[in-house]
Regions:
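Alpha-helical segment that forms one wall of the substrate-binding/catalytic cleft
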Residues: 71-129, 138-148
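Short, functionally critical alpha-helical segments immediately adjacent to catalytic or ligand/cofactor-binding
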Residues: 36-53, 69, 117-126
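Short, solvent-exposed loop/turn elements at domain surfaces
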Residues: 53-57, 76-79
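Solvent-exposed, acidic/flexible segments
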Residues: 31-39, 59-63, 67, 90-98, ...
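Short, flexible active-site loops
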Residues: 28, 51, 84-85
């Protein structure tokens, strides 16, 4: 599988300079998907979640960053992929948050999962693809994916 190389990006300071960190992505792909497909999917998720604004705080303060990551989601991802490291607050950094999302989905998505299944897991948790309430979310992500064609 080819590697996706992205430049190093410094996260914006959140409350104080101690939150300023850098992350380098050397490899980023969802299991069974190419890196280009993964990149497009992540862009669609980010657009739906936050309008691609990485500094958003939502869900009454429970979700942060462009992917609207909850602390429990982040913890599941870093427990699965210990190379992620960092702090929850690093989810304001797009590249870091992408690693978190990929790890979470690789942890919980069944082998060969469709884009729909992946989007619904992101939105509704490990069994989110079985929850009727995540169907509307998938339709939004699907529209974003279609714009990229």
């Amino acid at each position: 599988m080819p590697l996706l190389s992205l430049p190093m990006v410094a996260a914006k300071p959140i409350k104080n300079p101690s939150h300023l960190v850098q992350f380098k992505l050397s490899e980023l792909a969802l299991r069974g998907k190419t890196q280009l497909e993964t990149h497009k999917f992540l862009a669609a998720l980010r657009q739906v979640e936050s309008g691609s604004d990485d500094q958003v705080v939502g869900d009454n303060g429970k979700a942060i960053g462009g992917f609207q990551i909850w602390r429990v989601y982040w913890q599941d991802a870093v427990d699965y992929d210990k190379t992620i490291g960092g702090k929850y607050e690093n989810c304001f950094n797009r590249n870091y948050a992408e690693r978190v999302v990929v790890a979470y989905l690789n942890r919980y998505a069944p082998e060969g999962a469709s884009w729909e299944t992946l989007a619904r897991i992101h939105n509704g948790g490990p069994k989110g693809y079985k929850i009727k309430a995540t169907e509307k979310y998938w339709q939004k992500v699907k529209r974003e994916l279609e714009k990229q064609k």
